[in-house]
Each structure stands twice: as structure tokens, then as C-alpha cells.
């Protein structure tokens, strides 16, 4: 990317357009639409060319939805991505930790709301950048609980039934007794279900696929994230390291700033962990151009909204 293109990116970030595509005006809702369903896509060619420029998707790997589509209908080899999720740290192929999360819950990408993607990205940064370990499933279970998001719907007899939301039906919440860098995110991301597009799948290392084939099945009820006694003993050194990170004053904002400051997609498979990061020429970066602190702060503000978040220690 040229300096001129980077300047344009920074200008768009300041206006909040590049960082918050999910907040665009939505068309009339489709007949029969219920809370959590997909919305007709509002993604444009310009949006996807911008992702290509920034290295977040591969050149000529994407396809816009067909006119009149109200929900995704992917072709062979395609997967359904969302701008809201790409801007919060997901790109193909998925990081082994994130793929493990998806396999554990039998989940699709759209089952996770944008805030869940932001929390997962922050967790990967916490582990690789601040603790110095690969993202650890046991530590994740120590910190977070999983929860299902349900909606009420009238059946044919007029009785109310509960359904898990198709989009955003699976989220995560910090356990009350767990130590974790403070991070408050926007309560909701308006119209994020309209930010979908198609992208050719990219296989994970030593695998034949990246994301699972797209499905419109609703998520399964969230499984409990409980630790066994053996797991509690095994992760205690990591818990101690986490407590020390929090004691030093590291916040969730610090974690998010790594994502854009280093231009790394934490939920994308990489050839090395973040503790081996070497600078602007590092192979894990989506782009070698560095962004200003003002641009990074603007992006973080789009993710956190009006929520008050503590500031981390000065460097």
C-alpha cells in the first residue's frame, strides 16, 4: 500500500466508516425475518477491495452476494465471512485455537457475535503477547463461560417457543471470579448481520479445509466451560502469570491496540507466535505500513463504543 492509500485509510478510520461497516443503513426487513437472522448484504465492491489492500483477504478470492439474496447461499469451495468479524481480527485460514473453539461448539462463524470475535482476538493477544504461551484452552475455560442467545417465536398454534439466534447465538462472558484485563465493548453492533460476503476457503496447515462448509443450521445450546481438577492444577502457572499481567495494569484496550497497531489478525493461522514478532517487516502482518496512534485509537473506539475503559500503564 502506498503512503497515499494509507492516508486515505486513516481518514476513513477517523470518520468511522472503515471500522464500522455494520452500522450502515439497512434496507426493509425481509418477510418472516426474526431477530438474529441474516439481513440482505450491504457489502460493496469497494469494501472488499479495501480488505484486499489491507491484506485481510486474498486478491480475487471474494464474491459479492447476488442481487436479491436475503441470506447466504455459498457455492462449492466458498465460505461466508462478515466484515464485522474481519475488522475484529478474523481472516482465513483460521487460527488453530479458533478452529478448536468452533469444533468444540460445532459452530459456524456467524454463530459468534462481533463482540465474541473481539474477545477471542484479545485472548489470543493476551496469551501470545503478554503471557508468552500459545492460546490455552484450559486458561480460556478458567476465564470465560459460554452462553446462548435465544429469541421467542410464535409457532403455528400461537404458543411461544424459544429458538437460539442464527447469527450471534453463541457468546462468551467473563466469569465473575476470574482475573482478566478489563474490557468493555459496545452492547451491540447494529446490522452486523448485513455485512456478509463470499470468500474462497483457505485450508489450515495440515488440513483440507479452513472454515467448515456454510450451513444455515442454528447453533447448538452452549456447552459449559468447566475445568477438571487436573486442568486446574495444570493451568495454575498460567493463571499466576495472568494475575501478574493484570496487576501490572494491562487492560483490554492494550490487547486491542496490538491488533491494529501490529496489523495482525489474531484469529488467523500464522507461521509464528506473536512473541517472535520482529517489527513492520514481520510475516504475520497483513500490511507493512504503520498506522498512527490516532488511527489505532479511532479503531479501538469503534469497537468499544461509548463504554468507559481504563487506560493501561504508560510505556
Language-model features, listed with the residues they occupy:
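Residue-register detector that marks a fixed positional context within folded domains
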Residues: 1-315
Amino acid at each position: 500500500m502506498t503512503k497515499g492509500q494509507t492516508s486515505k485509510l486513516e481518514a476513513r478510520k477517523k470518520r468511522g466508516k472503515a471500522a464500522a461497516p455494520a452500522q450502515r443503513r439497512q434496507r426493509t426487513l425481509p418477510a418472516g425475518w426474526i431477530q438474529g437472522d441474516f439481513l440482505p448484504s450491504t457489502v460493496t465492491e469497494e469494501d472488499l477491495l479495501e480488505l484486499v489492500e489491507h491484506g485481510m483477504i486474498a486478491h480475487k478470492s471474494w464474491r459479492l452476494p447476488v442481487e436479491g439474496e436475503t441470506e447466504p447461499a455459498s457455492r462449492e469451495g466458498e465460505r461466508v465471512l462478515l466484515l464485522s468479524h474481519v475488522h475484529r481480527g478474523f481472516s482465513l485460514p483460521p487460527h488453530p485455537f479458533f478452529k478448536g473453539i468452533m469444533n468444540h461448539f460445532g459452530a459456524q462463524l456467524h454463530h459468534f457475535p462481533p463482540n465474541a470475535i473481539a474477545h477471542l482476538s484479545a485472548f489470543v493477544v493476551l496469551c501470545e503477547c503478554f503471557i508468552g504461551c500459545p492460546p490455552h484452552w484450559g486458561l480460556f475455560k478458567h476465564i470465560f463461560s459460554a452462553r446462548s442467545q435465544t429469541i421467542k417465536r410464535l409457532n403455528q398454534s400461537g404458543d411461544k417457543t424459544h429458538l437460539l439466534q442464527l447469527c450471534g447465538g453463541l457468546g462468551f462472558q467473563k466469569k465473575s471470579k476470574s482475573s482478566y484485563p478489563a474490557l468493555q465493548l459496545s452492547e451491540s453492533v447494529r446490522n452486523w448481520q448485513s455485512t456478509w460476503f463470499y470468500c474462497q476457503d483457505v485450508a489450515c496447515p495440515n488440513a483440507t479445509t479452513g472454515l467448515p462448509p456454510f450451513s444455515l443450521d442454528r447453533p447448538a445450546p452452549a456447552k459449559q466451560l468447566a475445568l477438571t481438577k487436573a486442568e486446574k492444577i495444570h493451568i495454575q502457572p498460567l493463571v499466576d502469570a495472568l494475575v501478574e499481567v493484570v496487576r501490572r495494569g494491562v487492560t483490554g484496550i492494550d490487547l486491542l491496540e496490538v491488533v491494529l497497531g501490529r496489523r495482525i489478525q489474531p484469529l488467523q493461522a500464522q507461521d509464528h507466535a506473536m512473541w517472535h514478532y520482529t517489527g513492520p517487516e514481520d510475516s504475520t502482518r497483513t500490511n507493512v505500513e504503520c498506522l498512527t496512534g490516532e488511527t489505532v485509537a479511532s479503531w479501538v473506539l469503534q469497537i468499544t463504543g461509548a463504554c468507559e475503559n481504563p487506560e493501561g500503564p504508560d510505556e
